[in-house]
């Protein structure tokens, strides 16, 4: 960034970053590199980088002793950014020292202080047209939008509009100016209060505004959620009662859900009753319908981007309601298309519901919601949290997927929620299989929400059958020795060809051999023994040629298996068919070759006897 305008007083906010004076650039990099946290180069990277992968590259430069700020500004300058753009970013960071440094170099710049009254409010069309689905109650006609005090009209049975009795003053009086005693929930950027207005309970979602520089960021997320709730209506999407932008307060008003979140009911928070399997599958189907409806809206699909068990509310009839659309995005209905977004440093807990392509590259698509919904299915089946407490720092998804790959689908059945009576195996196996496909590592391997909903609806009837239909053994895998803990015992097939049958010691082949319960076994193949002592003569040969008719009649002598002085082996050649008394394997006699060169057959021995 060689400076062609090095004289002070000659700098303009429209000056490109490539023309930034080297002295000013060096001092600016020194200030940002010396700071840690949000005022350092990391805080600058959160606003200039497209994904966390770019931040990782900058970290490598920093580890090599280079300036992270210089690398960031160099990459950003290639987008034709100006000094004025840099000052806007520094103002958003709240870095007054860096701002004063640039201004002291002669840059005439007036900071733009905007409030929410000056920000453009979205203009909604008089009539919103979208694809009418089976459960779609019809298009919603948004009310006239103003900035000071906006009320969202409700719909009666005929679909006409009627005003609500909610006012911002009634909310202030009902919550005593948002006192902590009425706080019932809290998120990353909002707080939830309960208020009773005219014998009706409501939940007020108040966006946090601790600093003025956060207002712009929260305003965008406020508009994102507001736009989704105004444009789209569904029985399983939480309806909006009212919203306000009053005295720098951004709040959304919803009907109060008495049964709380799905996460709290699965964890039985405050001693609540566990949900039955019938309720759980009904909740999954309802949320799948809501997500599928948003994915198929026209002309743009809606990506929720924040599907989790904590964002699923249950009403007094245990009907699910999907909520929290602050991270929603609109994109054209192209099946193979995905978009890249800027990630924020917050929401780390929700990252457990996000796939790898979002965490690494910030890629967002409809398959992102499918992945998050698959995690919710695993929570519903097991009743566990996304990150298990014991063992620590183990994700539920990784544990179940590893079990499926190592031991098969049936190994996951031991993790079913034990707080309620067990469900049929066929029902749980189908849900585990569906969850495994939803949380596949590659996005192209995940099903669409249409396929997920169809699979859930076809699985629901199997819950009402007490007996499971017969299944093939091919679906049952042999376990790995590394995964034999806390899982039902599974028979392991043993290959006799891999067993090395060595000569037993004398202590084992002595008198204890008669009382041994497990007989020795050998395959019908060529068997080689060490040569017997030639000094035994014919007596040893005759004894060796006798084949015991039963394992209980065997009487082994230690001397019979003692190795001879020469190393020539004694080979017993078994024909393709031979017969043992009491067993009919064939009629061909067995021939034995002894170390002394004598040949004898079973037939000849019978004649001698």
From Swiss-Prot:
Residues annotated as domain Death: 41-106
Annotated tissue distribution: Expressed in inflamed lung macrophages (at protein level). Expressed in dendritic cells (at protein level). Highly expressed in liver and thymus and at lower levels in heart, brain, spleen and kidney.
Subcellular location(s) of the protein: Cytoplasm; Nucleus
Residue numbers of Phosphothreonine PTMs: 110
GO biological process: cytokine-mediated signaling pathway; interleukin-1-mediated signaling pathway; negative regulation of canonical NF-kappaB signal transduction; negative regulation of cytokine-mediated signaling pathway; negative regulation of innate immune response; negative regulation of interleukin-12 production; negative regulation of interleukin-6 production; negative regulation of macrophage cytokine production
Keyword Cytoplasm set for record: yes
GO molecular function: ATP binding; magnesium ion binding; protein heterodimerization activity; protein homodimerization activity; protein kinase activity; protein kinase binding; protein serine/threonine kinase activity
One GO CC term, this protein: nucleus
Binding site for ATP: 184-192, 205, 308-311, 324
Site (Cis/trans isomerization of proline peptide bond) residue list: 110-111
Sites bearing Phosphoserine, chain numbering: 480
Deleted gene: phenotype: In response to intranasal administration of IL33, lung inflammation is reduced compared to wild-type and is associated with low infiltration by inflammatory cells, especially granulocytes, a severe reduction in Th2-type cytokine secretion, including Il4, Il5 and Il13 in bronchial alveolar fluids, and reduced up-regulation of Il6, Csf3, Cxcl2 and Ccl5 mRNAs.
Main location: cytoplasm
Top-rank taxon: Eukaryota
Keywords (A to Z) from UniProt: ATP-binding, Cytoplasm, Nucleotide-binding, Nucleus, Phosphoprotein
Domain spans labelled Protein kinase: 178-463
Family matches, as InterPro entries: DEATH-like_dom_sf (IPR011029), Death_dom (IPR000488), IRAK3_death (IPR042747), IRAK3_PK (IPR042698), Kinase-like_dom_sf (IPR011009), Prot_kinase_dom (IPR000719)
Role according to the record: Putative inactive protein kinase which regulates signaling downstream of immune receptors including IL1R and Toll-like receptors. Inhibits dissociation of IRAK1 and IRAK4 from the Toll-like receptor signaling complex by either inhibiting the phosphorylation of IRAK1 and IRAK4 or stabilizing the receptor complex. Upon IL33-induced lung inflammation, positively regulates expression of IL6, CSF3, CXCL2 and CCL5 mRNAs in dendritic cells.
UniProt family annotation: Belongs to the protein kinase superfamily. TKL Ser/Thr protein kinase family. Pelle subfamily.
Domain notes: The nucleotide binding domain binds ATP with low affinity.
Subunit text: Monomer. Homodimer. May interact with IRAK4 (when phosphorylated). Interacts (when phosphorylated at Thr-110) with PIN1 (via WW domain) in response to IL33-mediated (but not TLR4 ligand LPS) dendritic cell stimulation.
Protein's UniProt name: Interleukin-1 receptor-associated kinase 3
Organism: Mus musculus (Mouse)
